[in-house]
Curated annotation (Swiss-Prot):
Hydrolase is among the record's keywords: yes
Name of the protein in its database record: Hydroxyacylglutathione hydrolase
Gene3D superfamilies: Ribonuclease Z/Hydroxyacylglutathione hydrolase-like
Family as reported in the entry's similarity comment: Belongs to the metallo-beta-lactamase superfamily. Glyoxalase II family.
GO MF annotation terms: hydroxyacylglutathione hydrolase activity; metal ion binding
NCBIfam families: GSH_gloB
Chain positions recorded as Zn(2+) 1 binding sites: H54, H56, H113, D137
Substrates-to-products reaction catalysed: an S-(2-hydroxyacyl)glutathione + H2O = a 2-hydroxy carboxylate + glutathione + H(+)
Organism: Synechocystis sp. (strain ATCC 27184 / PCC 6803 / Kazusa)
């Protein structure tokens, strides 16, 4: 399965999955149609599936236009988003399984950013060691999504599920927010050597106009404060230890950063 990262809008990424054997494609969170259609034309592939992580317009904005061109599309989304994702045909629950391009995927229900948010984890293919996590706006490289419809306790539970996945998991989040996220992370975890090194690398990447996505889940576990609510240094920094309170404090600080 080839994964094509397609820039969209101001800072979104759309991900197009290509099954070369069958010459079929699936798209994750199509914010707009043109990048998807251009990529499909280049590949000469047929679009068969949309995977939506949640209902926000910058993740489902192209659903209707793509359905107009490919009326037999299956549109996947969480069952809690029924009526909020245009054209949705498949209503997923936590633990559901699906497959694309001979890769098996598990659905994770991860409320917090929105009440119906889901993530898709594609386990490594045969003979491979790297998995792929499409997490929408739940985890960002160096950060996490705002809590529009959920609570800190929900987000701790949701991210807690995802951080149990292997370190050798590529994290395909939907926005290029990494540099700003790491600037904030350094204010709450300033002695973290891995974080300091990552910031320098990302700063150089962005100065050269390079994308920072995908990230690695192992990197997030070491450097992303929103996966480190149980780290003693971060707990000391915010003056509390209960996971939801630590997370809520971090999120509030980031909202005002």
């Amino acid at each position: 399965m080839d994964i094509h990262r397609l820039p969209a809008l101001a800072d979104n990424y759309i991900f197009l999955l290509h099954d070369r054997q069958r010459n079929q494609a699936a798209v994750v969170d199509p914010a707009e149609a043109k990048p998807v259609l251009d990529c499909l034309e280049t590949l000469g592939a047929d679009l068969v599936t949309i995977y939506n992580t949640h209902h926000h317009g910058d993740h489902v904005g192209a659903n209707r236009e793509l359905l107009a061109k490919y009326p037999n599309l299956e549109v996947y989304g969480g069952v809690e988003d029924q009526g909020r994702i245009p054209g949705q045909t498949v209503f997923l629950r936590d633990g559901d399984r699906l497959s694309f391009a001979d890769r098996e995927a598990t659905v994770y229900f991860v409320p917090g950013h929105t009440r119906g948010h889901i993530a898709y984890y594609f386990a490594p293919g045969s003979g491979e060691t790297i998995g792929d996590l499409f997490c929408g706006d739940t985890i960002f490289a160096g950060g996490c999504g705002r809590l529009f419809e959920g609570t800190p306790a929900q987000m701790v539970q949701s991210i807690g599920k995802l951080r149990q996945l292997p370190d050798q998991t590529r994290l395909w989040c939907a926005h290029e927010y990494t540099l700003g996220n790491l600037k904030f992370a350094l204010t709450v975890d300033p002695s973290n050597k891995d974080l300091q090194e990552r910031f320098q690398t990302v700063q150089g990447d962005r100065q050269r106009g390079q994308a920072t996505i995908p990230s690695w889940l192992g990197t997030e576990k070491r450097t992303n404060p929103f996966l480190r609510w149980d780290n003693p240094a971060i707990q000391a920094r915010v003056g509390m230890t209960e996971p939801a309170r630590v997370f809520g404090k971090l999120r509030g600080m980031k909202d005002n950063f």
